Swiss-Prot record:
One of its GO terms (biological process) is proteasomal ubiquitin-independent protein catabolic process. Ubiquitinated by E3 ubiquitin ligase complex formed by CUL3 and RBX1 and probably targeted for proteasome-independent degradation. Quinone-induced oxidative stress increases its ubiquitination. Keywords: Actin-binding, Cytoplasm, Cytoskeleton, Developmental protein, Kelch repeat, Nucleus, Repeat, Ubl conjugation. GO terms for cellular component: chromatin; Cul3-RING ubiquitin ligase complex; cytoplasm; cytoskeleton; neuronal cell body; nuclear matrix; nucleoplasm. It comes from Mus musculus. Kelch repeats lie at residues 296-340, 341-388, 389-444, 446-492, 494-538, 539-585. This is Ectoderm-neural cortex protein 1.
Length: 589
């Protein structure tokens, strides 16, 4: 009887215009959770007791397993715990923190504040409440400060909170003067102290502070840490210390004189220092290499795209100051800095002839000289420094020359220049020829991003050169096909900005040079094609470029800690930037 009635109803419904009706009550999940929470509070149908401190919490296994992989594994495994009706956390988790986690499990809500954020993050990670862990990390990111960034660095490292770690790390680098006085600094593990003090981005212009911080860390637990002294000394740019301080304070330090390896490190630094003071050749030792905060920014440009002048960017005064005329004006060249020198390679002159020439500007002595010419005349190429050598990558060349190619074909050829021998050498060619690519070095490798391919298309590839193996690979693709972009490096992150499309011209990304992963960052302040970028200290600077007929007139700065771009100053209208480099500022005496 019931079947026939059902069939009759179905038959009547089928004659209408609506055959299916999906009913969904949006508040249903909330109402179920609310009722489950009420059942928990009344201890109805609960099947497990959680103990923390002196408190006990009755719960439903199914609810806990649904929101925590930790409990899911515990209750579904074949171990003893899966059959137990009680779980005892003892003192491994505070009862008030466990109560907050359980309230979240039964309500999907929790209040995070300054008092509980760290404890909640730790407990959320321990019990695998991933949403809670991530929410607490986001809260702590927004409340990051120079006074707490060291603690956040340790916390995020212990619990794999990647973004919180990166932001804390950047803030530590940017606020070294503050964090070195913090008690947390003295309690950092050895590997983290070494990583911090050796960083190129550590913001200090006085290496005495780095040396004193290293010695303070050693002395804090001398018995256990004395063996790390040689490694800590190698993080200090000892040859950049004032000569008197190096000779009288460092070389005479008892902890150093009593340890053979440490003594040898200081003696080598003294030899480098004397070589610098006597201007006796090129000093390439790490102990004599200024950090990026000890760098000066130089802009190359002119009143047209024909570059004829070099300018100094005064970051403090926010001024762009003319410094020197370029001996041979040119366009579509590439510029790169090694130490205190700016290398200008190739390009096209006023007659549009493609050049092999290499001009070198010594910022210390403020004079130009000519280096050995490249093996291939080229323009539209990229250049970067790697292990104290200059590399030129891709570009176009003329129809005649050492390695002939049509002017319309992008080159595969890559050359290496050694400043100590003044000689050029061919190295392994690119996997695909490119021009107008963004070329940088990071983590002892060269990277070429995008560019114009041999077939005139925008290349959506990242090409990577391994100097040890002398070969190029393609470890990743770009988020979009790119050319006329700019790139600059902070640590293991390569930042790419600008481009020749409506979208890419205002976008910016960062590329991890170790994992080859891309992350979108804040958009630049203005659309830019053919812009130029450098890193200085813990920040990025971008200048120049245009979009359509509109020229970009500002010098902008990006702070990765805040993920924010700001305009620093206005570029004179009469100046069209064509290259941007960062050199060593000085070699202190």
């Amino acid at each position: 009887m019931s079947v026939s009635v059902h069939e009759n109803r179905k038959s009547r419904a089928s004659s209408g215009s609506i055959n299916i009706y999906l009913f969904h009550k949006s508040s249903y999940a909330d109402s179920v959770l609310t009722h489950l929470n009420l059942l928990r509070q009344q201890r109805l149908f609960t099947d497990v007791l959680l103990h923390a401190g002196n408190r006990t919490f009755p719960c439903h296994r199914a609810v806990l397993a649904a929101c925590s992989r930790y409990f899911e594994a515990m209750f579904s495994g074949g171990l003893k715990e899966s059959q137990d009706s009680e779980v005892n956390f003892d003192n491994s988790i505070h009862p008030e923190v466990l109560e907050l986690l359980l309230d979240y499990a039964y309500s999907s809500r929790v209040i995070i504040n300054e008092e509980n954020a760290e404890s909640l993050l730790e407990a959320g990670d321990m019990l695998e409440f991933q949403d809670i862990r991530d929410a607490c990390a986001e809260f702590l990111e927004k409340n990051l400060h120079p006074t707490n960034c060291l603690g956040m660095l340790l916390l995020s490292d212990a619990h794999q909170c990647t973004k919180l770690y990166e932001l804390s790390w950047r803030m530590c680098l940017s606020n070294f003067q503050t964090i070195r006085k913090n008690e947390d600094f003295l309690q950092l593990p050895q590997d983290m102290v070494v990583q911090l003090l050796s960083s190129e981005e550590l913001e200090t212009e006085d290496e005495r502070l780095v040396y004193e911080s290293a010695m303070n860390w050693i002395s804090y637990d001398l018995k256990k840490r004395y063996c790390y002294l040689p490694e800590l000394l190698q993080t200090v740019r000892l040859a950049l210390l004032p000569a008197i301080y190096l000779m009288e304070n460092v070389a005479m330090e008892e902890l150093i004189t009593k340890q053979r390896k440490s003594k040898e490190i200081v003696e080598e630094a003294i030899r480098c220092k004397l070589k610098i003071l006597q201007n006796d050749g090129v000093v390439t030792s790490l102990c004599a290499r200024p950090r990026k905060t000890g760098h000066a920014l130089f802009l190359l440009g002119g009143q047209t795209f024909m570059c004829d002048k070099l300018y100094l960017v005064d970051q403090k005064a926010k001024e762009i100051i003319p410094k020197a005329d370029i001996p041979s004006p040119r366009k579509e060249f590439s510029a790169c800095a090694i130490g205190c020198k700016v290398y200008i390679t190739g390009g096209r002159g006023s007659e549009n002839g493609v050049s092999k020439d290499v001009w070198v500007y010594d910022t210390l002595h403020e004079e130009w000289s000519k280096a050995a010419p490249m093996l291939v005349a080229r323009f539209g190429h990229g250049s970067a420094e790697l292990k104290h050598c200059l590399y030129v990558v891709g570009g176009h060349t003329a129809a005649t020359g050492c390695l002939p190619a049509s002017p319309s074909v992008s080159l595969k050829q890559v050359e290496q220049y050694d400043p100590t021998t003044n000689k050029w050498t061919m190295v392994a060619p690119l996997r695909e020829g490119v021009s107008n690519a963004a070329v940088v070095s990071a983590k002892l490798k060269l990277f070429a991003f995008g560019g114009t391919s041999v077939s005139h298309d925008k290349l959506p590839k990242v090409q990577c050169y391994d100097q040890c193996e002398n070969r190029w690979s393609v470890p990743a693709t770009c988020p979009q096909p790119w050319r006329y972009t700019a790139a600059a490096v902070l640590g293991n992150q390569i930042f790419i900005m600008g481009g020749d499309t409506e979208f890419s011209a205002c976008s910016a990304y960062k590329f991890n040079s170790e994992t080859y992963q891309w992350t979108k960052v804040g958009d630049v302040t203005a659309k830019r094609m053919s812009c130029h970028a450098v890193a200085s200290g813990n920040k990025l600077y971008v200048v120049g470029g245009y979009f359509g007929i509109q020229r970009c007139k500002t010098l902008d700065c990006y702070d990765p800690t805040l993920d924010v771009w700001n305009s620093i100053t206005t570029v004179p209208y009469s100046l069209i930037p064509t290259a941007f480099v960062s050199t060593w500022k000085h070699l202190p005496s």
